[in-house]
Amino acid sequence: MTRTDTTSLTSRWDSALMRNYGTPPLELVSGRGVTVTAADSREYVDLLGGIAVNALGHAHPAVVDAVSRQVAELGHVSNLYIHPTVVALAERLESLLAVDEPVRAFFCNSGAEANEAAFKIARRTGRSRILAAENGFHGRTMGALAMTGQPAKREPFEPMPAGVEFFPYGDIAALTALVDLAPGDTAAVIVEPVQGEGGVVEPPEGFLADVRSLCSEHGILMIVDEVQTGIGRTGAMFATRRAGVVPDVITLAKGLGGGLPIGACLAVGAAGELLTAGQHGTTFGGNPIACAAALAVLDTIETDDLIPHVDRLGKIIAAEIECLDHPLVDHVRGRGLLLGVVLTAPLAKAVEGAAREAGYLVGATAADVVRLAPPLILTEEQVARFVAGLPGILDAATPKESTS
C-alpha cells in the first residue's frame, strides 16, 4: 500500500507542511453553495466563507464556468503582455468606484500584496511616515506587517521596515496630534472601515470622513484597506461608499476572486501616477484566470442584486442573535455579512468548536468575539436554522460549574 492509502490526511499534513497553521480540525474535500463536506462525508454550513473569501459560496456555476472557459483559452502570460480580461476588470472596478478622477489598478494575488503596493505608493510621495491604526491588520508580508497594529504578530520578525507609527483606531484627535508632529513628512494614513481580524470593530460615525479631511488638509494619502470589507461584504460594494469617502488608494482581495487568488490596489487621480515602469511588479498578479473569476463575481453580485440582500440579512442575523438574550452574548457588531458576536466571556474558541460539532463553521477572531463572514448567497432559511441552534452551541461552549 502507498502512504496515501495507510496514513490519514491530518497525519500527512503534520508531516509535510510547515507548522505555521498548526493542525486544522477538519479535512474538507468538497463544497457546494454554503455547504462544505468533510472527508468523513459530514456536511457543514460555512459561515466563515474561507475568511470572507467565498463571496458566492463554493463551486458557484458562474465562477466555475468563467474559470473553465478562461483556462481553456489563455491561462497565464505574465505582465509582459496585455490580455483583455485584466483590462476589463480594471475598467469595471473603476466604474464601480464611480469617482470623478481617473483610477489606475495594480493586480496581485492577495490582500497583503495589495497593501505592499500601497506602502510603495506612499513612499513614492517622497515622504517617509505612514500612520496606521492600533489593532489593525494589513497582512503578513514585511511591509504589510509593519503597518499591522498588533505587536504579537510583528515581534517575532523585528526589525520591521521603519517609519510606521500607530494611533488608537477611531480616535481622530490622537491621529491629528500624530500628524501634527511632522505633517510635511507624513506620506499616508492607512485604515480599515471595519477591523475584521481585530475583532470586527467599527470606528465612531464620521471617523473616515474626518480622516479624509485631515489627509486632504496636509497632502497626505488616505489608504483604505477594504480587503475584508470590499465587494459587497458590508452591504455596499465598498464600505467607504457608505461613509461618503473617496480614498486616494483602496486595497481589495478576499471576495474579489470568489475563491481564486487575486488582490487589487486601486489608486485615484495623482496617486495612480506615482508608480512608474519597473518600480513594482508581480509574476502572477492579474492573470487571465483570476481576472475572469473576479468579473464573474462582480457580474453575479449585480445581476442577483446581492448587495441589498446582504445589508438586510446582516440586520436580521444581528437582531435575532441579540433577541436570544443568551447570557454568553453581549451584543453583535459589524455591517452586512461581516459580523462579530461579542461574548461576555473569553470563550470564542470554545464557541467555534461547539459550532463545528453542531455542523457550522465560524471563526474566533478575538478571545471574546466570534466572526461570521458567510457567502453573500446565504439564505434566510439557513440563518433561521443557525439561530435556532445557537443557544445549544453557546450552552455547549459554556463551562459547567462543579457541583462538588
For each feature predicted by the language model, list its residue ranges.
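Conserved N-terminal phosphate-binding loop of PLP-dependent enzymes in the Aspartate aminotransferase
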Residues: T2-S404
